[in-house]
């Protein structure tokens, strides 16, 4: 299955290598640093529990070129070649304790940090993996989003929604560019509101999820539904690319 976290973010690829992607934070308190370390340790333990003790994990600061280089060096040392990866990296400092800043109060730094981590990271990660010959020709890239990238919604996403809109547009551009050059596919999947992830738990309220469940013709999708769609898009030699797919129980068709 896949997991989208607020801090740190993660992506899971199809070769049982899992990377935790963190953004660069300066002047951390001991308490904050301890929290980040515990988050990574918890994630690493969860991966091993679900995927086996031999699963590879690697901490990554997605904002630093030297950290990306360390990742690709690690993968090459392990002789890992990727036939695809799931990008589920996201961060937004304007959401705190289920409260979101109005758009006009978002600072340039907050906007740019969210865009860099949540959208541009797709470019920097793909470039690093291709340059190092880790990502193979004919591979599949999948990104995660939600309906708020397109419409104003009752979910508490404002700044992040803009980053997700950018991520979706980048996915389409990469479908064209990487498809022409390397036969690589790129698709995006929009998922139902979900509180089982750290991001969802930090932002959504129970009533948000319940409301979406009532509105959706099939009710909210669950993580297994999302995982099945991602695995389908990872399949070899299917000519599906540049799509924004919906795994949301039909929520997106409702007015």
Regions found by a protein language model. Give the residues of each.
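Short-chain dehydrogenase/reductase
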Residues: 1-109, 122, 126-127, 171-172, 201, ...
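A glycine/serine/threonine-rich, flexible loop-to-helix segment
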Residues: 46, 158, 181, 188-216, ...
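Residue-level signal for the nucleotide or nucleotide-sugar donor/cofactor binding architecture
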Residues: 63, 120, 220-224
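Generic structural signal for alpha-helix termini and adjacent loop/cap motifs
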Residues: 78, 128, 132, 235-237
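C-terminal substrate-recognition "lid" of short-chain dehydrogenase/reductases
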Residues: 80, 219-247, 252-253
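Hydrophobic structural elements of the Rossmann-like NAD(P)H-binding subdomain
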Residues: 86, 142, 186-189, 242, ...
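Catalytic loop of short-chain dehydrogenase/reductase
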Residues: 90-181, 190-195, 219, 251
